[in-house]
Curated annotation (Swiss-Prot):
Gene Ontology BP terms: translation
Protein's recorded name: Large ribosomal subunit protein uL10
UniProt family annotation: Belongs to the universal ribosomal protein uL10 family.
GO cellular component, one term: large ribosomal subunit
GO molecular function: large ribosomal subunit rRNA binding; structural constituent of ribosome
Assembly description: Part of the ribosomal stalk of the 50S ribosomal subunit. The N-terminus interacts with L11 and the large rRNA to form the base of the stalk. The C-terminus forms an elongated spine to which L12 dimers bind in a sequential fashion forming a multimeric L10(L12)X complex.
Highest taxon of the lineage: Bacteria
Keywords: Ribonucleoprotein, Ribosomal protein, RNA-binding, rRNA-binding
Function summary: Forms part of the ribosomal stalk, playing a central role in the interaction of the ribosome with GTP-bound translation factors.
Cited InterPro entries: Ribosomal_uL10, Ribosomal_uL10-like_sf, Ribosomal_uL10_bac, Ribosomal_uL10_bac_type, Ribosomal_uL10_CS_bac
CDD domains: Ribosomal_L10
Amino acid sequence: MGRTLANKQDIVTELKGLVDEAQMAFVVDYQGLTVAEITDLRNRLEASNSVCKVTKNTLMRRAIADADDWQPLTELLKGTNAFVLVKDDPGSAIKAYQAFQKDTKKTELRGGLLEGRLLSSDELKAIGDLPSKEVLIAQIAGAINGVATKLAVGIKEVPNSLARGIKAVSEQTDA
């Protein structure tokens, strides 16, 4: 038995809510995956605050119909698609998918959308290679701390150099 119109409308409403919350989306060809493998993918993505939805392309097309930023995604709505909607950290979601793909070797990354721009699978992989937000913050903090340390050492060195110069001059006059 097929889905009723009310059921489809509920799915579209749910997808609209997820799209509104999402910062990014990417599309995966899930053909050949078992239910257990899709569940595994969903569990891995949950840690990065992402949702994996397997739905008809027509329902996703209707969910993004009113959102202009999401229109480029319609180019990817062909075939058997799973939609990964990322709420917070795109890098960690892509890394979670790449780890899953490495383990199963059954899926294909078709492309994605970030800030209204369609991304190829290579561009998505490049985003996955970037360090996480926490690592970037730590690197910036370390760089700032390093500059402050060098500045403090430099300021401290001025009186020390002056003292050594005075001592050298006094030793020359004594000799």
